[in-house]
Design a protein with these regions (language model features):
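Short, well-ordered turn and helix-capping elements at secondary-structure junctions
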Residues: 78, 104-106, 133, 231, ...
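Short, solvent-exposed beta-strand edge segments and adjacent coil->beta transition regions
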Residues: 20-22, 158-160, 290
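Flexible mid-to-C-terminal extensions adjoining Fe-S/redox cofactors in radical SAM and related proteins
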Residues: 1-19, 41, 253-315
């Protein structure tokens, strides 16, 4: 499972209707990790710990399906699996044959059967995990991953682990720590930061190619190793987020955010009759967007398809 802009080809009719394909649902606004790089620590948000109740989830999810959403991602915000109603929520999704995925730190064991379960691991031992995620939980997460796949269970769920790469040395160490696990993919991601402030132009031209080359060398002997597509988008700065329509993100109160990386920009509420119109008309400051982000490549496709083309009758 991967975020892939080519998936948009399967939804060509939506370029006209501009109705969302994927929904990101924040089940909580609190977390059991303390990651220093967390997107949601950058912004000043409303205080107080909150979670989406089961009844509210069913109401919001039903509304999303009415709007045409095809897939749901349980994410945050906070850590989705520590929502007290998490098991009831996933049971409802599965009983209604709704395709969904989970982004989690997996500090708490859960036993659902989503399309994918992506574990943000980021460390290769207890100390590196504590340094990157603020708590001692590495061994617990590894055991939870093993337990999830024990006795041949959940073979229809695409199970993966990922790391946000900071330096060359950790690439090999991370791989050595997870290569024996029964996972379907091992993802190496770049840092996502406001207008790419984490990387200088020199980093993109010199350091990043060294990192990606090393990741690719590992992938040659282990097909599970994935070089995240965002590595190739570090020098792409869209002029506008024309592909924002492809996703819709709601927080634990049902508020629609402009996107999952901008929780401070509230467009309206998912129950508003005109919420898609409000979202289409909302203006965001692109200079405060993350570069790269999941929609970077989709924005390139949107821009290409929006351009007038001469002699398009000849293919």
């Amino acid at each position: 499972m991967a975020i892939d802009s080519l998936k948009l080809i399967r939804h060509m009719e939506r370029f006209k209707t501009q109705t969302p394909i994927t929904a990101d649902i924040f089940l909580t606004n609190f977390c059991n990790n303390k990651c220093p790089y967390c997107t949601y620590h950058r912004w000043s948000l409303d205080p107080g710990a909150r979670y989406m109740s089961y009844n509210d989830f069913v109401k919001y999810a039903t509304r999303l399906l009415e709007l045409g959403v095809k897939g749901v991602i349980l994410t945050g915000g906070g850590e989705p699996t520590i929502n007290p109603d998490f098991d009831k929520i996933t049971n409802w999704l599965e009983s209604n044959d709704i395709r969904y995925g989970i982004n989690t730190n997996f500090n708490v064991f859960r036993d659902p059967s989503p399309v994918y379960l992506k574990v943000s691991l980021d460390g290769y031992d207890e100390e590196s995990y504590k340094r990157r995620r603020g708590v001692h939980a590495y061994s617990r997460v590894i055991e939870n991953i093993k337990k999830y796949r024990s006795d041949g269970r959940h073979k229809n769920t695409s199970l993966g682990v990922q790391i946000v790469v900071n330096e060359l040395a950790e690439i090999e160490m991370f791989y050595d720590g997870v290569k024996y696990l029964d996972v379907d993919y091992i993802v190496y991601r770049p840092i996502e930061s406001t207008y790419r402030c984490a990387y200088s132009d020199n980093d993109v031209q010199t350091t990043v190619p060294i990192l990606t080359k090393h990741i690719q060398s590992i992938s040659r002997h282990d097909h599970r190793v994935v070089l995240n597509a965002k590595w190739n988008q570090l020098d792409v700065f869209p002029k506008e987020c024309g592909a924002n329509w492809t996703q819709i993100s709601i927080d634990e109160r049902g508020n629609v955010m402009y996107c999952c990386h901008k929780p401070y920009e509230i467009v309206g509420n998912i129950m508003d009759d005109d919420i898609l119109e409000k979202k289409r008309n909302f203006h965001t400051d692109i200079s405060k967007c993350d570069v790269p982000c999941r929609l970077t490549a989709s924005n390139l496709i949107q821009e290409y398809l929006s351009k007038p083309m001469k002699d398009d009758c000849f293919v």
